[in-house]
Amino acid sequence: MRRPFKAAAPTKDGPRSNRDIRVPRVQLIDAEGQNRGDVSINDALLLAEEAGLDLVEISPNAVPPVVKILDLGKLKYANQKKAAEARKNQKVIEIKEIKMRPNIDSHDYETKMKAVRRFFEEGDKVKLTLRFRGREMAHMELGMQLLNKVREEVATIAKVEAEPKLEGRQMMMVLAPR
């Protein structure tokens, strides 16, 4: 036996409104914000129609559900504006990478540290990568000393998020701003 295809009901975004509200009685708040009390859904729909506005479900889980007479278009627009504002104010934290060698010169080190501090001021995380070449692999302690020196210098403005670890010929440490 073949079963007929039953498509899922289309889901609407936002609160239920007007005829979508399927309860016999509701708690009504009119357009002026006055609580009209417990009324039938038909009376509430008539009042909304007379006002030229929509009946919108504000609190569906209350008993009876709370509905308000307002302009649904304005409500959706305000919600979109609020969401856009929240997205605009969101800061994406990036991970900036600083590459060094274990036998870095003092001036080069200072230049790299200036960049590290600038990244922390911008609110970004910093991944310090030490690359070992050739026989430098025999002197891992120099790399650890360098990473510890960096850690001490930025201790007031940053915290260690990932302890120094060795991966192949590289030693890495991740720092995050405080």
Swiss-Prot record:
GO terms for molecular function: ribosome binding; translation initiation factor activity. It comes from the Bacteria. It is found in: Cytoplasm. Keywords: Cytoplasm, Initiation factor, Protein biosynthesis. This is Translation initiation factor IF-3. The gene is infC. Residues 1-20 are annotated as: Disordered. Belongs to the IF-3 family. IF-3 binds to the 30S ribosomal subunit and shifts the equilibrium between 70S ribosomes and their 50S and 30S subunits in favor of the free subunits, thus enhancing the availability of 30S subunits on which protein synthesis initiation begins. Coiled coil: none annotated. One of its GO terms (biological process) is ribosome disassembly. Monomer. One of its GO terms (cellular component) is membrane. Pfam families: IF3_C, IF3_N. The lineage of its organism: Bacteria, Pseudomonadati, Pseudomonadota, Alphaproteobacteria, Hyphomicrobiales.
